[in-house]
From Swiss-Prot:
GO terms for cellular component: cytosolic large ribosomal subunit. This is Large ribosomal subunit protein uL11. NCBIfam families: L11_bact. Keywords: Methylation, Ribonucleoprotein, Ribosomal protein, RNA-binding, rRNA-binding. Disulfide bonds: none annotated. One or more lysine residues are methylated. GO terms for biological process: translation. Belongs to the universal ribosomal protein uL11 family. It comes from Staphylococcus aureus (strain NCTC 8325 / PS 47). It comes from the Bacteria. The lineage of its organism: Bacteria, Bacillati, Bacillota, Bacilli, Bacillales. Forms part of the ribosomal stalk which helps the ribosome interact with GTP-bound translation factors. One of its GO terms (molecular function) is large ribosomal subunit rRNA binding.
Amino acid sequence: MAKKVDKVVKLQIPAGKANPAPPVGPALGQAGVNIMGFCKEFNARTQDQAGLIIPVEISVYEDRSFTFITKTPPAPVLLKKAAGIEKGSGEPNKTKVATVTKDQVREIANSKMQDLNAADEEAAMRIIEGTARSMGIVVE
């Protein structure tokens, strides 16, 4: 018989840098998870993606065991990396902070495809372009 899921914890953690300090420790401690076990496993699984923020969904079972799924980094993080900027514009409709090419948008859309609610590559690109627009990034 399959184990029954007790809780689902969603976090965004820098790749390879999970440690028992907040926000990871308190969130997992409340769920009764072995915090160091999670941190070691997460860091091993994400060490090749250093510098990116990785969303993770942790399923905690009734017997306090857990499994987790790592997702692709959020689109704004990938857009900031592609554009080479620290943060988006405070007034995106007035102040443009950077420019990305269609090819960069296509690359981001392809990497995010599994997490986006899009039927095809074009729809995924439109989603990423909308995110870029709301950050004050121009798509050429």
